[in-house]
Amino acid sequence: MYHDFESHTITRRSFLKGAGAVGAAGLLAACGGSSSSTAASASSASSGAAASGKGLSELFTYETSGREIESWNMLYSQQAIDFNVTTNIIDGLISFDNYGKPVPALAKSWEHNEDSTVWTFHLRDDVDWVDMNGEVQDHLTSKDFLVGFEWVLNAKKNQAANTSMPSTTVVGAADYYDKTYGMDDAAGEALTYEDMLAAGVGIDAPDDYTIVYTCINPCPYFDTVASYVCCYPAPPALVEKLGVEGFRGVDYTQQWCCGPYLIEEFVADNSKRFIPNPHYYAADECNRFERVSLSMITDLTVGYQLYQNRELDELELSESTLTTITSDTSNAYNDQLCEKRPTKYAYDFHFNFYCLNSDGTPNENWNKAVANRAFRRCFQEGLNLIPYYARFNKINPLKCENNYYTMKGVCYNSKGTDYVDLVAKELGIDGEKYDGETMVHLRKSTADSIAALKKQAMDELTAIGVTFPVKAPFFFVAGDTVAQDNATVLKQCFTDSFGDDFIQLELGTYVSSLAKEVRIPKLHGFVINGWGADFGDPVNFVGQEILHDSNAYYAVNYSNIQLVAEDPADYQKELVDEFEQFTDLVNAANAIVDDTDARYEAFAKAEAYMINNSLAVPCYYDVRWCLTHVNEYTKINAMFGPCNFKYVNWETSEDAYTTAQYEEFAKAFDAAKS
């Protein structure tokens, strides 16, 4: 059910009237952390300009249609649309500050041995599980982490979700998963954490407030693994109460919480309301809102109306709204336009190599075309996406250009070199810099070279019966005018780059769930999807595209290359061979465990191979302009983990921030970061 936003019968102030208030605590840099160094970091991000007016006690924010939460189980979900909600009700061992540095959460401290093979986490002793009514249900101890870890590794309970990280890092984890995978459902579901320990999995709880993980090999980045949901706790009593199917599909009314907020109200596809957890362990160590009200909106145009009525406190701007504001010098919002930081996600074209028609028959024309390397290289070498980038950042569109599969800032070698700079060197673009005018991958392309590549693809494909133009099924959520306009502009980019005789986007819509309505039925020709790191190592990105791994998220769920590899047609054998070579390169890089620099160099070669063969094609970074009463530079900003949408320690202002203030915020943030 959608709220009729046009009527505005429920105003911001009338909604607030009579609402219960829960006092907010003092400001520190990160909930759960109280060190003076992190507190200083938090304040430094905003010291460049004073906030105008007092801060907000209640926050009104939004999510767009088609991005409704699908799972309330953090151990089971692998989607940002879920974590953006559940991170506010359940905490993990580690959180992050506004610079992306690890800070304490459920673990008050941690350390590792000399070679980083044994990691010990010391838990707080003041954490309780509460239900959605705020009533204490149980006390959190190390046993909860044993139960949670067994759940993740048990194929009959968690169905392979989130197993790739522990399986490749923790002793015995992969073997335990394989053991449970081979069992019948009843036998697997009956196993407990004690069976996991008996099987030799490298996790131990020497006392009620200590958890120890033993790694297969030296793992200097394991703290970033431990920050992810694969290492989150599960309350034993709740798991026992709900049973396996019940806990896997737990809803918000059943869930127990140990995070900063509770869900006061949830109306699917309409709204959510968060209120402070009255028993939150870090209540005196961070600041929270008295209430967070999140509305599902059909598109950003509706969001702009809500922002103008002060029914939203922050809003990313669509291209059309940004144009409306900037084209009118008298517009009141002209001096309030704020450019945001890039999100943690690197967006890519993810091809579907096993596309089906709506009747379940193979889409042979697309499948043949996309298996052809020259066809895919046209996406890489000939597609001018600047008009598409302008849909996200009209003022500085090329700030959105992405040339890598892995997100910037995920990891650095011993010399402080960003991993993606190593990839750039392998690709031969390390000398290319942002110029605000030309896409990097088009600088070496000419009209003749693009035409030659197009001709090569058409000749090779015509020879195996492909008809032109090739129709590429591409879907967006119905009713979202911004998404529709984005898709329309993307379609025009293909026309402008290649003409209409080669590739044409065949636009389609889904009602509410891309997964259920498009991805699972395999209807997409390609999707543009973003991946954010779960932990700080390149394998977490490129490992999602490999063969022979049931945990490779994109290979299993989007490209369907693993299905193709089982019985490839003649026209798919070269494609499968390319994926096999890529998989070998990734596995070889992942086997280097005693030399981080060599490991990253090997991964860079693997990633460059993937990009050069266009097995997936880098597309964009999300760099938006916004109107806001929230200082983005005080939000959690980690390149990995699920914590970035946690509503804690946000600096806000009753008056909207200005462009000048945000420029000062950025300068202060960068100065403090360096």
Residue spans of the language-model regions?
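Detector for C-terminal structural segments
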Residues: A21, L28, C378-A424, A478, ...
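Ligand-site clamp/hinge motif
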Residues: V244-Y252, H279-D328
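Aromatic- and charge-enriched surface segment that lines or borders ligand/interaction sites
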Residues: K108-G172, V212, G303-L306, N365-A371, ...
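Alpha-helical secondary-structure segments
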Residues: T141-V147, D208-T214, P260, F289-R291, ...
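Ligand/substrate-recognition segments at binding pockets and active sites
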Residues: A268, N396-P397, K433-A533, E578, ...
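N-terminal secretory signal peptides
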Residues: M1-I10, G18-A30
